[in-house]
Amino acid sequence: MEDRRAERSCEQACASLQRQDYDMALQHCTDALLSLGQYSMADFTGPCPVEVERIKIESLLYRIASFLQLKNYGQADEDCRHVLGEGLAKGERAFRAVLCCMQLKGKLQLVSSILAKSLSGESLNGMVTKDLTRLKTLLTETETATSNVLSGCHVEDLDEGSCNGWHFRPPPRGITSSEEYTLCKRFLEQGICRYGAQCTSAHSQEELAEWQKRYASRLIKLKQQSENKQLSGSYMETLIEKWMSSLSPEKVLSECIEGVQVEHSPDLSVTVNTKKSHQTWTFALTCKPARMLYRVALLYDAHRPHFSIIAISAGDSTTQVSQEVPENCQEWIGGKMAQNGLDHYVYKVGIAFNTEIFGTFRQTIVFDFGLEPVLMQRVMIDAASTEDLEYLMHAKRQLVTTAKRWDSSSKTIVDFEPNETTDLEKSLLIRYQIPLSADQLFTQSVLDKSLTKTNYQARLHDLLYIEEIAQYKEVSRFNLKVQLQILASFMLTGVSGGAKYAQNGQLFGRFKLTETLSEDTLAGRLVMTRVNAVYLLPVPKEKLVQSQGTKEKVYEATIEEKTKDYVFLRISRECCEELSLRPDCDIQVELQFQLNRLPLCEMHYALDRIKDNAVLFPDISMTPTIPWSPNRQWDEQLDPRLNAKQKEAVLAITTPLSIQLPPVLIIGPYGTGKTFTLAQAAKHILQQQETRILICTHSNSAADLYIKDYLHPYVEAGNPQARPLRVYFRNRWVKTVHPVVHQYCLISSTQSTFQMPQKEDILKHRVVVVTLSTSQYLCQLDLEPGFFTHVLLDEAAQAMECETIMPLALATKNTRIVLAGDHMQLSPFVYSEFARERNLHVSLLDRLYEHYPAEFPCRILLCENYRSHEAIINYTSELFYEGKLMASGKQPAHKDFYPLTFFTARGEDVQEKNSTAFYNNAEVFEVVERVEELRRKWPVAWGKLDDGSIGVVTPYADQVFRIRAELRKKRLSDVNVERVLNVQGKQFRVLFLSTVRTRHTCKHKQTPIKKKEQLLEDSTEDLDYGFLSNYKLLNTAITRAQSLVAVVGDPVALCSIGRCRKFWERFIALCHENHSLHGITFEQIKAQLEALELKKTYVLNPLAPEFIPRALRLQHSGNSSRQQQSPPKVKSLYHPQSDHFQSDGIVQPNPSVLIGNPIRAYTPPPPLGPHPNLGKSPSPVQRIDPHTGTSILYVPAVYGGNVVMSVPLPVPWTGYQGRFAVDPRIITHQAAMAYNMNLLHTHGRGSPIPYGLGHHPPVSLGQPQSQHAEKDQQEQNRNGKTDTNNPGPEINKIRTPEKKPTEPKQVDLESNPQNRSPESRPGVVYSNTKFPRKDHLNPRHINNLPLPAPHAQYAIPSRHFHPLPQLPRPPFPASQPHTLLNQQQNNLPEQPNQMAPQPNQVAPQPNQMTPQPNQVAPQPNQVVQQQSQAPPQAPQPAPQLSPAFQAGPTNAFFNNAVAHRPQSPAAEAVGPEQPPPPGLPDGHSPLRAITQPGPILASPLNNFVDESSPGLPIEEALDGVHGSVALETLRQQQARLQQWSEHHAYLSQGGIPYSHHHHPHLPHLPHTPIGLHQPPVRAEWKVAGRADDETETTFSRFQDLLRELSHRDQGDTGELAEMPPPQSRLLQYRQVQPRSPPAVPSPPSSTDHSSQFANFNDSSRDIEVANSPAFPQRLPPQLFGSPFSLPSEHLAPPPLKYLAPEGAWNFANLQQNHLIGPGFPYGLPPLPPRPPQNPFIHIQNHQHAAGQEPFHPLSSRTVSASSLPSLEEYEPRGPGRPLYQRRISSSSAQPCVEEASAPQDSLAQGKESQGHSNPPAFNFPAPESWANTTSSAPYQNIPCNGSSRTSQPRELIAPPKTVKPPEDQLKPESGEVSSSFNYSMLQHLGQFPPLMPNKQIAESANCSSQQSPAGSKPAMSYASALRAPPKPRPPPEQAKKGSDPLSLLQELSLGSSPGSNGFYSYFK
């Protein structure tokens, strides 16, 4: 009873406190504590100690609150100390648990608010304040943490009971793979992180491990859910999964099907002009002959709330019977209508749409008649106000050109006279010239990790020069052609108004600024702030013929004034006379801006003036003491308005000078009274004797404030000693200065200019007020250091350290230095990415803030904000200021809108062709509408509505222009629309934030949260993502508002992308709690986030059309394929001009563009030719990410943004994927990375090649592909995508649109027979040219190389794709070898005659390609066969799905016989695989041989499923499922490739002939003879699961391998040839891109199918290799016998983190051998080259010695490059980059050797093994090496897809190296899909024909890898980095690399930034 009594008293105390009955509350608390006092801790009969502790702490907290309210501070303080002592003594975690519990019950807020009020309102003594503040901080942290947990509650959190079992913060949302979690470098190095609890990176290894566990547990739950749903599973989800994973999507969903005619009204694409709109569509389906409609469903999840099925009727053309349709119906199930023998039947279906928000909404309606393909129709509605684009479309007034700079060598320059530069300025300009040799810039000081006393001057000098180069490049981008109005005088209005008259023969010229040059663009900002002169060239009316040798004259003119719209020039007398200029006339001129170098020279000067920099590096080992006394604290002379913290600051500043203090930091956000505090301190200092004060600010306006508001009134009040001297810039126009300030300035007798001060002027004044830039005048007066006793710097956070130190040149160690500012506001802008990485932009305040410990007495945080509403303050306090801010002002709120409000707009962000910025029209219209509404409802309490009342802030210039234009149309020009950079220091009553970005343009760039950028605070990502990533930007914007912050944007994107996602999640949660979330519900947001994270592909509408802005639609309808994505710069050498990729379509942006600009994500070029689908939306499109080169599945408009999913990119680009999650092997050229590798390969960006074209370049046929594949796989793993077909969804995601080749819409394969058959384009399979750089080792065209005549089997590389007529292929004759091959590969009976399908087996139906989702994955091989060669069988309906979908191993997947063409294996494979027909002969049938991938081919899926695995934990298994899908795909591809096999004879050694790929239908016979289990060959190959890999694998690393592989791959090609249906644009895209060969295409040949599909795991692959002569002794013996008997070490599951969701190795038991992967561990000698090499191969050989593996730019192994000794030869050296920059660092690639040796037992070991291994063998890092979760080198091999596992290297095959096979790494997810492994699939994905038998592959791989472990390092020039595929250089041995995550991170961080200036490639 006692314990109940205590608890009851505690509850009553809480209730009393809420009623504000404090005495009663106190009484109850005391009762509770007395009751508890009766128990001793050892008393077991009492309540449990934990409960006692909880009640005790709770009671004490209520007591403290009550005492504070009763003003009993002493008692409150005593209890406070008691709580802190007790709590911390018992362990902080237990204490926090109690607080969390209170917070969850809503009890903590009460105590916390009382504490906050007491601290802010009362003058408490120091000690009391200290204890209470400490307690308040603890409570705030708890509130923050719990609110984050609640708002971020992930699925698993909810399932496990809030927060039970987890000890750390919840992980960030929007992560699609555990691999995307990263460690926070800043926190690990410095122990503090500005993002605090909101950081999206883990703050310890333990937290990282927990996040990965949580992710895994969510995946497990997801798998369990999906298994539970298996029977009742969602039809829509299943259908989409099936469509996504099918390589022939047109067989799953099609816009037209035979026998059904569709009519619809109105148009499928509708634009409405109002926000609230309603639309209905009616579809009439006429079926002849009559057929049953089983289902109608809406597929697309994101916009589901807006669409519903409203009516369905059926009958003949005259009578219709209505069917029952439930309300808000999303899926209607029919099948009950009687058709009564009618010859036709008509169905009418009504679909309704409703919206109340602006946006672009899409939906796909499917009509299922029980057969595949299922009929679909897409509708789109664009809710946007009528957009008049005239202001964008009119010819720009200024023609902006990029021209050569004018200098004395090209023009005669007439300088402006009189020149007003002083001698000092001239000397500075001469002294600080940029060094001619860049080597002088890149000294060791720049390379050092951080700024130190010793490298201080040298490092900052160099960084300033580098920044100057970047600014110069930025400014030099413009030449403007303008009409210059000549004026004799002009007048300015406003405060700074006045008239100016030209004298002495000079005149003024005025020209108008346009968007190009406004403060809103980067270059415009530079022109407005750093340019003070222009060169002016008159443009003659008619072109004058210039005589040879004469140079044109250009005239210098100075900039007199700049206003928002105009720039006024002063034109010299000489110019006026020579050009006969007269006032009031106009002249057409060309202008070139001249950068003002003086400010930078002054910073150099300041650096050199600092004699002793000890002041800048204060010693903090001894904590200084600031004397405190009651007299000082309550000094009557202190202003009573000072609050406690401000008093503390004044006491510190006025501490006697005899006590030395380090610089005092007064940190305070906007509105906390920093200026007020400094002014009060200054008055106080003046009362001390012998003091002199220098007050320095960053801006003139702030300096004037000190005089107008503080010093002037103080002087007037009778304090003449305080009379200040205000020093102004000498050229400042006097009229523009406030009259009050005039009396404190030195003005010339003519009253026209300010004078420079002399030493005596300074001596007469005790207070001098200057700006940072004018403080240099004082430095020139020979004032001795220490002249000023106090130096107060205000706005210190807005200036770079080099600027701040100028006044500090006058300080000594005894000078009291004070820096005031807000470290959380925007840092100064630095244009050079390189300098930004080295923190040039960081202010001295910021650096010292981090240098000082948390409780340092000289770091004072002012915490009372007087300017904003409490809700706004609380939000910023909690998120940015550690909970220390309190609202002290009383700002009125709006009655209808809570101060934090969110308006949803689900638009799509778009980027103009030549712009770096984005705009989002839905947000434009929403903002304008809300502004109008607010003006109508303006509260009286808010005062008059004027210019400063409403502000609209956005990060992008394009959005600023659009919002301004829209507001102008509504006559709302008094609303301020600005970029965030321009609003510092301003305040608005109401602030609207337009966030602009959506997942559609962000997510792909940001996969594993960019390794480097996530660590850099003001990185390019921040610039580019705006509010999504830059917390300072966000804080700066929000703190501008007084009463209302209204955000307009896409909530799902905000919560799932960028480093600020947790800030946004909290914001939206607060809006939800306060009912201010409009346009979407919090539940919908959470559901979409969960779907997104758990990879429900349907969130990404796979069928969504590509978004084309209306403005561009017309252009597109023409031949839009030629539209360039970026400003044309160079023709790509890689594209033959006739090729389908328009060479000019891809243009590299000028490198200077990259310097400070956000990287531009161009919208991908439209597909070739007129767009048939323009009106309808095209399907998801595969694009190449401009930044990463990854192929992205661009699904427009997902939930507002276009979602991007990675897709296997046919074109492997090595460095790209790595941009974010960097696989060391992948990124080889840091420089290239630095420069946006996207620029590297233009190839992918042109118009697309028809499907299949790029699939596997013959060159890449070989391993390289697999390497790529592997890499991709890893990447995929990294990215965590698992779709089979798009194995690399993430990866693709990563590829930005620019990178991808234009996407052709998918064309139905069937419809375009030419595309279909493998033979059809023998020569074309991969035009080399198509995927140039990445695919080619050499930039040169393959065409130019001497190539042998292509064999029929090879694809001729240089051929463009011409559709060839399809060769006749018999439908599936039993005899067709091709089919056989496929079947074999797939393990499915291909032809009826061959074997009867076993009952279990799914008979392939002709059209159905994908296996049922529910089935456990069919073996890939089977699938492929089924799809490709399966005889039609009667569909067996699955019970739960409509007939089209049958479940289980039924034939449903292939209900329709696949008609004449090899199916694309990959597509098919994707489906779940089915077990092999029991009938398959075990070992003998040829079929069998191939079919059974046997151990070798095991499909990832199958393996996963089959063996899910002894070795794998369930979550891995999950991953496997996805991976397997990918595997499957790979397999299928492989099969495809095989169809094209090259030397069939060679391959078929076993006696099984390989058919030529001419005969698509002749399957290449299995390479059975080689008895290997195919998979082993893949030691490195990726399993299908790694689709990405596959994609990347395009180039063979080893030619021989290639050769061998090519055979197989070719088979694949056949499949490739097929073209996907138009709707599957994405797929097609995929195909279009040159694909890397499948990562894991193990040759099907030797699969031994002894058992049905049991062996499908990889082991089979391994086995195959093992058996294969090629690797005879390499495999562990166990492999031979059993498919899965790997050594136990191999069974250890890889760390979760590296499970590749998609591309994981699925074979649980098998090790993945990456034969073709990063390195071949086996020591096999290279195969001798075969004469009939594929031309590509020749090329490669041409470049490499026979033993070397060809370099595949993308492949991971290529990256390792160990095999490329002669890299340098290939490295193109471009102009434009100094040699010192050219060497590419090899750090990115790491030797695999060690990895290879890593025992498979544990990944962890893998990590160690990195250190020890046989170095000689390879230099490529094993994938696993970076996969180890536990490994200290987590970043080494991070699978791009985020999958948890990386693939293990070739351990299997090469036991000695013990590298793990990729299979293990495959995510279990893959398991679902693949039960068996399809070569075809692999081939399809990887696209490399099997050129050699497995064994050979292995051998060659091995040798090559061993051969050149130490490839020479390539040197690369900046330009070449931009243009050429990155060449990997041999990776350094891993052992040498720091394996700890930090070091890896740092390395990675060096080269990957998109916008960099590129200097660091050299550094690395």
Curated annotation (Swiss-Prot):
<dbReference type="GO" id="GO:0005634">
    <property type="term" value="C:nucleus"/>
</dbReference>
<feature type="modified residue" description="Phosphoserine">
    <location>
        <position position="1763"/>
    </location>
</feature>
<feature type="zinc finger region" description="C3H1-type">
    <location>
        <begin position="178"/>
        <end position="206"/>
    </location>
</feature>
<keyword id="KW-0488">Methylation</keyword>
<feature type="compositionally biased region" description="Basic and acidic residues">
    <location>
        <begin position="1268"/>
        <end position="1281"/>
    </location>
</feature>
<keyword id="KW-0597">Phosphoprotein</keyword>
<dbReference type="InterPro" id="IPR049569">
    <property type="entry name" value="HELZ_DEAD-box_1"/>
</dbReference>
<dbReference type="InterPro" id="IPR036855">
    <property type="entry name" value="Znf_CCCH_sf"/>
</dbReference>
<feature type="modified residue" description="Phosphoserine">
    <location>
        <position position="1788"/>
    </location>
</feature>
<keyword id="KW-0347">Helicase</keyword>
<feature type="compositionally biased region" description="Pro residues">
    <location>
        <begin position="1365"/>
        <end position="1374"/>
    </location>
</feature>
<keyword id="KW-0863">Zinc-finger</keyword>
<dbReference type="InterPro" id="IPR045055">
    <property type="entry name" value="DNA2/NAM7-like"/>
</dbReference>
<feature type="modified residue" description="Omega-N-methylarginine">
    <location>
        <position position="1245"/>
    </location>
</feature>
<feature type="modified residue" description="Phosphothreonine">
    <location>
        <position position="1163"/>
    </location>
</feature>
<feature type="region of interest" description="Disordered">
    <location>
        <begin position="1360"/>
        <end position="1379"/>
    </location>
</feature>
<dbReference type="InterPro" id="IPR000571">
    <property type="entry name" value="Znf_CCCH"/>
</dbReference>
<dbReference type="Pfam" id="PF13087">
    <property type="entry name" value="AAA_12"/>
</dbReference>
<dbReference type="Pfam" id="PF13086">
    <property type="entry name" value="AAA_11"/>
</dbReference>
<keyword id="KW-0539">Nucleus</keyword>
<feature type="compositionally biased region" description="Polar residues">
    <location>
        <begin position="1116"/>
        <end position="1127"/>
    </location>
</feature>
<feature type="compositionally biased region" description="Pro residues">
    <location>
        <begin position="1635"/>
        <end position="1644"/>
    </location>
</feature>
<keyword id="KW-0547">Nucleotide-binding</keyword>
<feature type="compositionally biased region" description="Polar residues">
    <location>
        <begin position="1755"/>
        <end position="1765"/>
    </location>
</feature>
<dbReference type="Pfam" id="PF00580">
    <property type="entry name" value="UvrD-helicase"/>
</dbReference>
<comment type="subunit">
    <text>Interacts with POLR2A. Interacts with SMYD3; the interaction may bridge SMYD3 and RNA polymerase II. Interacts with SMYD2.</text>
</comment>
<comment type="function">
    <text>May act as a helicase that plays a role in RNA metabolism in multiple tissues and organs within the developing embryo.</text>
</comment>
<keyword id="KW-0479">Metal-binding</keyword>
<feature type="region of interest" description="Disordered">
    <location>
        <begin position="1116"/>
        <end position="1135"/>
    </location>
</feature>
<dbReference type="Pfam" id="PF00642">
    <property type="entry name" value="zf-CCCH"/>
</dbReference>
<dbReference type="InterPro" id="IPR041677">
    <property type="entry name" value="DNA2/NAM7_AAA_11"/>
</dbReference>
<dbReference type="GO" id="GO:0016787">
    <property type="term" value="F:hydrolase activity"/>
</dbReference>
<protein>
    <recommendedName>
        <fullName>Probable helicase with zinc finger domain</fullName>
        <ecNumber>3.6.4.-</ecNumber>
    </recommendedName>
</protein>
<feature type="region of interest" description="Disordered">
    <location>
        <begin position="1631"/>
        <end position="1655"/>
    </location>
</feature>
<feature type="region of interest" description="Disordered">
    <location>
        <begin position="1743"/>
        <end position="1964"/>
    </location>
</feature>
<dbReference type="InterPro" id="IPR047187">
    <property type="entry name" value="SF1_C_Upf1"/>
</dbReference>
<keyword id="KW-0862">Zinc</keyword>
<feature type="compositionally biased region" description="Polar residues">
    <location>
        <begin position="1826"/>
        <end position="1849"/>
    </location>
</feature>
<dbReference type="InterPro" id="IPR027417">
    <property type="entry name" value="P-loop_NTPase"/>
</dbReference>
<feature type="compositionally biased region" description="Polar residues">
    <location>
        <begin position="1897"/>
        <end position="1910"/>
    </location>
</feature>
<feature type="binding site">
    <location>
        <begin position="668"/>
        <end position="675"/>
    </location>
    <ligand>
        <name>ATP</name>
    </ligand>
</feature>
<feature type="compositionally biased region" description="Polar residues">
    <location>
        <begin position="1799"/>
        <end position="1813"/>
    </location>
</feature>
